[in-house]
């Protein structure tokens, strides 16, 4: 990742701390992965606090595939089957079947409806009957161990939410350019600046976790 582009956001450790502060303040974070991986930036928000306005921003500027990152325990609690039994996608992204809140939504497409679906899925006592399938929110099952196991946006989202003190659940969507192409690091960083988002890389998060968990052990 081009460190010159990221230098205005601090050192790798500072970027993680600023990202955690942003999440606690109810703001979004732009998470970048490696240039030799997907080379994309994902907007992420805590599932607990994401607003309708933030969802609308995500839908307007993102790929349209609004994903809810969850743990395996939550997937089992909601009885969500994986989308396919044999995952042959390039990076093994853990899609489950799509979901919609069973109550409180109309078509499920609007920003408000998608927030309602997210809240229904992460509620403490959520049960399978609280959700209809299919729907317009795409759950992603994170790998246990987070970014130390798999360097994906899904795992980064769960790790960041956990470190920030939230439930291990977050919403992500890939940033796209106005012409429909995928936004790369320069566009992602510019967008983050325009929308008061922190910027962090998965590489930053790996280093942060390794350092902090080494201290604990």
Swiss-Prot record:
One biological process term in Gene Ontology: riboflavin biosynthetic process
Binding site for D-ribulose 5-phosphate: 37-38, 42, 150-154, 174
Gene3D superfamilies on file: DHBP synthase
EC number in record: 4.1.99.12
Biochemical pathway: Cofactor biosynthesis; riboflavin biosynthesis; 2-hydroxy-3-oxobutyl phosphate from D-ribulose 5-phosphate: step 1/1
InterPro entries assigned: DHBP_synth_RibB-like_a/b_dom, DHBP_synthase_RibB
Cofactor: Mg(2+); Mn(2+)
GO molecular function terms attached to this record: 3,4-dihydroxy-2-butanone-4-phosphate synthase activity; magnesium ion binding; manganese ion binding
Catalytic activity: D-ribulose 5-phosphate = (2S)-2-hydroxy-3-oxobutyl phosphate + formate + H(+)
SUPFAM superfamilies cross-referenced by the UniProt entry: YrdC/RibB
Binding site for Mg(2+) 1: 38
A cellular-component GO term for this protein: cytosol
Keyword entries, A-Z: Lyase, Magnesium, Manganese, Metal-binding, Riboflavin biosynthesis
Residues under site feature: Essential for catalytic activity: 136, 174
Domain of life of the organism encoding this protein: Bacteria
Database matches in Pfam families: DHBP_synthase
Residues noted as binding Mg(2+) 2 in the record, renumbered to the chain: 38, 153
Cofactor binding: number and manner: Binds 2 divalent metal cations per subunit. Magnesium or manganese.
Subunit composition and interactions: Homodimer.
Family that this chain belongs to: Belongs to the DHBP synthase family.
Functional note: Catalyzes the conversion of D-ribulose 5-phosphate to formate and 3,4-dihydroxy-2-butanone 4-phosphate.
Protein name: 3,4-dihydroxy-2-butanone 4-phosphate synthase
Species: Salmonella arizonae (strain ATCC BAA-731 / CDC346-86 / RSK2980)
């Amino acid at each position: 990742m081009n460190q010159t582009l990221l230098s205005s956001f601090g050192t790798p450790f500072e970027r993680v701390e600023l990202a955690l502060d942003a999440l606690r303040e109810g703001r979004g974070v732009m998470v970048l992965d490696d240039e030799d991986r997907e080379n994309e930036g994902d907007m992420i928000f805590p599932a607990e606090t994401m607003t309708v306005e933030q969802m609308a921003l995500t839908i307007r500027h993102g790929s349209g595939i609004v994903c809810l990152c969850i743990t395996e325990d939550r997937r089992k609690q909601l009885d969500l089957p994986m989308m396919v039994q044999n995952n042959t996608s390039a990076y093994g992204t853990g899609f489950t079947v799509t979901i919609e809140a069973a109550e409180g939504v109309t078509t499920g497409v609007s920003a408000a409806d998608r927030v309602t679906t997210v809240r229904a899925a992460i509620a403490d006592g959520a049960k399978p009957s609280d959700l209809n399938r299919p729907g317009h929110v795409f759950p992603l099952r994170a790998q246990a161990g987070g970014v130390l196991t798999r360097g994906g946006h899904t795992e980064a989202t769960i790790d960041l939410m956990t470190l920030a003190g939230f439930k291990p659940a977050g919403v992500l969507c890939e940033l796209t350019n106005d012409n429909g192409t995928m936004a790369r690091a320069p566009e992602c960083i510019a967008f983050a600046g325009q929308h008061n988002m922190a910027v962090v890389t998965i590489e930053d998060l790996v280093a942060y976790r390794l350092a902090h968990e080494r201290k604990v052990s």
